[in-house]
């Protein structure tokens, strides 16, 4: 009788125990994030500009330290992935509205014809993931910064905090540029090229999302260059001297990103990529001047 009562008690209390476990997990996770976030504002114990390569070499000398870094990386990746999945699940409810907006360059969602029965759900999931990534990007960048924080100076950590909104802004600007500037002429060219075609949702949304994503990533270059020059990984003059190679690389990237084969649409991508590169070079010289001044004062 006692065993039956115990089993009955475990059964009726199981939902409450699960809720308690879930709340403890969530609040523990939040507390862990705040503890990691507090490390961004602690004062430095060492010099201001320790070389990154030397710091990496010291970390690799101790195998135990390597495993600690791997465990920390796993923790930050797990949290970032979990937030990405949660936000993507939330945006799934608004995927139909997002699909309608993305279909405007082709004349509306009615212009798309699904061939396979699972095609619609696949498109919904891809659009939800891209939208979720866009909204989760600030937190993903924060997790990257929290992982790198122990090896950064206080000044670098503060710059990382300020850079989080800049990363999001640049990514969104790249996506907006792809949607409003590049996509309309590209769709007109592809739709009217020799043969009349019935466009599938999967093919249309795949190339639209790829175009917007990679343009968004490309627009992060100036900020990335500023960070690398500030950390002493590269020098600004090297970027200026290699500008001819960068122009060729930008042309190759434009050819890979552009969904059409005409030179007009390629130029629509190529010219902004070159402009983004030279903006990065300008920021690199600003970062180089600031770094040289700090080294002279040290």
Describe each model-derived feature in a short phrase:
Residues 1-298:
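Membrane topogenic/interface segments and analogous intrinsically disordered interaction regions
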């Amino acid at each position: 009788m006692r065993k039956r009562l115990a089993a009955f008690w475990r059964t009726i209390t199981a939902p409450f125990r699960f809720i308690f476990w879930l709340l403890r997990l969530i609040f523990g996770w939040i507390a862990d994030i705040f503890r990691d976030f507090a490390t961004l504002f602690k004062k430095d114990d060492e010099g201001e500009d320790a070389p990154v390569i030397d710091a990496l070499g010291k970390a690799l000398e101790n195998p135990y330290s390597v495993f600690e870094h791997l465990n920390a990386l796993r923790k930050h990746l797990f949290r970032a992935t979990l937030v990405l999945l949660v936000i993507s699940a939330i945006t799934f409810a608004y995927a139909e509205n997002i699909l309608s907006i993305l279909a405007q360059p082709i004349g509306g969602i009615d212009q798309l014809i699904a061939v396979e029965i699972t095609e619609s759900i696949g498109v919904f999931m891809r659009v939800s993931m891209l939208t979720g990534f866009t909204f989760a990007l600030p937190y993903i960048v924060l997790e990257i910064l929290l992982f790198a924080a122990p090896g950064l100076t206080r000044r670098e950590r503060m710059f990382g905090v300020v850079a989080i909104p800049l990363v999001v802004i640049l990514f969104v600007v790249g996506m907006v540029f792809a949607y409003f500037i590049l996509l309309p002429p590209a769709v007109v060219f592809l739709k009217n090229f020799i043969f009349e075609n019935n466009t599938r949702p999967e093919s249309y949304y795949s190339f639209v999302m790829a175009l917007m994503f990679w343009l968004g990533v490309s627009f992060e270059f100036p900020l990335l260059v500023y960070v690398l020059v500030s950390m002493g990984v590269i020098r600004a003059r090297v970027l200026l001297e290699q500008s001819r190679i960068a122009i060729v690389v930008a042309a190759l990237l434009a050819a890979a990103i552009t969904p059409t084969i005409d030179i007009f649409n390629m130029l629509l991508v190529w010219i902004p990529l070159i402009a983004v590169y030279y903006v990065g070079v300008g920021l690199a010289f600003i970062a180089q001047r600031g770094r040289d001044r700090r080294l002279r004062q040290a």
